[in-house]
């Protein structure tokens, strides 16, 4: 990853402490400052999640194992210490809001309704003023138990605008298959012929985004946005081997 030179103005006493710690670790001042910043960022977890509940995810209120699919999704998010949830809905907003209200298991719920279907990317773009930091996004019709903290670590290690959780399936030809090199997603192949798949990895429907993503959201769907990110080598892949079920 390319580095840039910056200048900082610190109190002399604080700088002495930095130099002392750098000497103890046999680092120069620049290396020590980088380590301090990295440690701080790594300690900051995610607290905001966007859930796609409209369009193709409109089945999120269908019953699965005794309760709406969306309830299972929110159970996972709150279990991962998410305390702010933004639900992007469509014509199903009234049903969702009547069921969940303004909070769920201690997490505040906000609603954003698409008056007309405009695609996932367009819907997400309208939440930009509400989100000013790294955030999680999930498909409201997919059940997973992705370790968000571990995924966030990979996201920060790679330093890209977005990270996509990936899972393996037995029938990859029925999905869009991911081409991956290391942790960098190179592209996608939509429903390849059986036996000709470049991998068994598919999009698991869980994402981590930096706020810079909002400047990319001028397309009709996230698939197009992801294609742009792969062209710029700005999309990371997080391979995930836990529970995964598309309820559509």
Regions picked out by a protein language model, each given a short descriptive name:
Residues 90, 112-114, 165, 238-241:
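Conserved beta-strand termini and adjacent loop/short-helix elements that scaffold enzyme active sites
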Residues 10, 53, 89, 166-167:
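Short beta-strand/turn micro-motifs composed of small residues
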Residues 158-168:
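A short, conserved acidic/glycine-rich loop-to-beta-strand motif
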Residues 10, 91, 138, 180, ...:
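A conserved hydrophobic position in a structured secondary element of the catalytic/binding core
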Residues 2-5, 15-16, 20-25, 30-57, ...:
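Conserved N-terminal catalytic core of the sugar/cofactor nucleotidyltransferase
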Residues 24, 136, 143, 149-156, ...:
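Catalytic-core segments of class I nucleotidyltransferases/pyrophosphorylases
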Residues 9, 142-145:
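A short, conserved beta-strand element in the Rossmann-like catalytic core
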Residues 177-180, 237:
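A structural signal for short hydrophobic beta-strand segments in well-ordered beta-sheet cores
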